[in-house]
Amino acid sequence: MVKLTACLLLLVAAVQAKLPVTPISQLRAESHRNKALVARSQDVNAAFPAHTIQIPIDHFPKSSRYEPHTTEKFNLRYWFDASHYKEGGPVIILHGGETSGEGRIPFLQKGILAQLAQATNGIGVIMEHRYYGGSLPTPDFSNKSLRFLTTEQALADTAYFSKNIKFPGLEKYNLTAPGTAHILYGGSYAGGQVAFLRTQYPDIFWGAISSSGVTKAIYDYWQYFEPIRQEAPQDCVHVTQNFVDIVDNIIINGKNANTTRELKNLFGLGRLRDADFANALSSGITGWQSTNWDPAISGKSFYQYCGEITSDRYLYPVTAQQKASAKRIIEAGGHGREAPEILPQLLNFVGWLNKSTLESCSGQGQTAEECLNSYDEAFYKQDNADQSWRAWPWQYCNEWGYLQTGSGAPKNIRPVISRLIDLPYTSNICKQAFGITKPSNVDLVNKYGAFDIEYDRLAFVDGGSDPWKEAGVHATAARKRGTSTNKPFILIPDAVHHWDENGLYPNETTAELPPQRIKEVQAEEARFVKEWMKVHIYIDHQTFTGIRKNLSLMNDELPAHVLPFLVPPTSTKNAVSPSHEQPADPRIAISSWACAGLSVVVARICCSPIGYRCPSRDLAAQPSKSKKDRRGQQLSPAAGDPIVCTGLTTRLGFVSFLVFAFSSFTFIPDIETLKAAVLRSGEVLWSHDAAAECCCVLSVLFAASCTESRKLRLDI
């Protein structure tokens, strides 16, 4: 039963092929489906019940954007699996994104979340996004209520979650960040979210994997169809382009009402507006996004569409009787010379659309016009608690854009959807539902880095054939990058939308499934996350006691002679700050200080600023033109990048670390004022260069061994 439910939930998440403009009937069905899922979630998912944590509705009480402010909290839902957990393991959070969290639950058992939790002895978590599923901060979806649905508020939710979470049944462990490593995973919109979280809250999140992450908000996202045009089966693409030519030549260029009427009647859509008609015809090609390597969850519509429109046989006897009308339409659309070839293709398209769409509409008691219409001002004005469809349009109308048009394609490109699908049409929902008449303020998203976003332990995994690729760091317009363990940058060939996310149970695998490229990518993700865990350091904010967390729990254990210096305390609750301990003999303090100082010198030599990146809100300032790194390269930050650490900042970081070491081993009772500098210097210690990083690790191990007599435990 659990496996069947998991399959169904994944199927729902995968096969929802989105038209450029979602018809009202689908918006209504989406709200009903969400309500039903929330109502029966506890029964269906008994193995993984929903839990809640109270989150502030408003994280920014000083911002005028959210006036009037509120101090209230709401229940945000999450699910977790601790079956792989061992003390010291990380918390792996899969960000729920712009959908109900129920659709992500199968990833607790199979897929990348389960794999990472198993590889690191961690806890797998699914965290729902505010205003989706059952995580509703407000009693309705009115504009006034939706003012709290913004990117920055959603990011702050996740940060609050990680700093305050207490998992039921695991209360004896302190599993909050940053004491426990919290690592994020997200796909698509959620992929953008986790990338932003790593750069905006680097002191909370130890790492993140952004899969098919959209980090660049684009208002007119005509590029959505470029990977389809370039990567989908070319015979299918060519036939689709011919159909689009015919439709646009008749409706846009021909302006003959009789021919337009005959074209629409051929498809049984005579009463639809022109743009709604063109939108309905795009339902086949837009199914590309829902394809997946796993046949059990892959959308079937795309390949059914392609198989039928590329056939030279008449597959539907009923539509074959309309040859005369279809031939006139082909000729009026400028493809008369190709009529013998296009005729069966066009009539098969008519038959396919009737079978895949119109029969479904009639089965629901709707006419084609009711089913495919996107104009209904009365519907759009509804904003009660049942109108959950309003959440994502609110986000893209205000901040993200992503209006998928055919009109935006350059003139030298034969589009795969009609140019009738333009900005006025795709933005109509913004105007009718929310009264928004201006383009989305994409700067509110792009300020986080857009194409240039980059950070230590921030991985990007994309599909080479993903329609959303052009909105992420692998876009044609983005700069080229290399890949490393510290900054993985992976493009999966012939993969579509976050194909690395789902997986199979062991008894479901075959020689062909998962495909080798998927197995390799998921294995690589597990590898570099384990490597990230090896250098996890946390200096306790309250006690400044370094807590070793993770190394002995990895599959590749440390040598036995190293472990005595890395024994984790059972609890830090009553730990005594090393700065408050009085050494029994002053010589111990002196030798400890000297040893710690020597380790800092070693680290300073090995870890000089080769491409350092400072955490956000750190001590670094804009480097002057005279500043160069030790390789003689100019230190100047790229647009959108975190500020490059200057030599001065690096020296300050090491000085603060040295002062911390001194105060920890001598008699200074209060070093609260040094807390910020110490925490910042810890990040500066770590170079992007693997050899230097190794040297850093050795220097801290050296310090740990020197200070064993003082019971100072260092976490690496």
UniProtKB/Swiss-Prot annotation:
It is a single-pass membrane protein. Its main location: membrane. GO terms for molecular function: carboxypeptidase activity; dipeptidyl-peptidase activity; serine-type exopeptidase activity. The active site is at residues 188, 466. SUPFAM superfamilies: alpha/beta-Hydrolases (SSF53474). Its EC number is 3.4.-.-. It is an enzyme of class 3 (hydrolase). Glycans are attached at residues 143, 174, 258, 354, 507, 550. GO terms for biological process: proteolysis. GO terms for cellular component: extracellular region; membrane. Keywords: Carboxypeptidase, Glycoprotein, Hydrolase, Membrane, Protease, Secreted, Signal, Transmembrane, Transmembrane helix. InterPro entries: AB_hydrolase_fold (IPR029058), Peptidase_S28 (IPR008758). It is found in: Membrane; Secreted. Residues 617-636 are annotated as: Disordered. Disulfide bonds: none annotated. The chain crosses the membrane at residues 652-672. Residues 1-17 form the signal peptide. Belongs to the peptidase S28 family. This is Probable extracellular serine carboxypeptidase. The lineage of its organism: Eukaryota, Fungi, Dikarya, Ascomycota, Pezizomycotina.
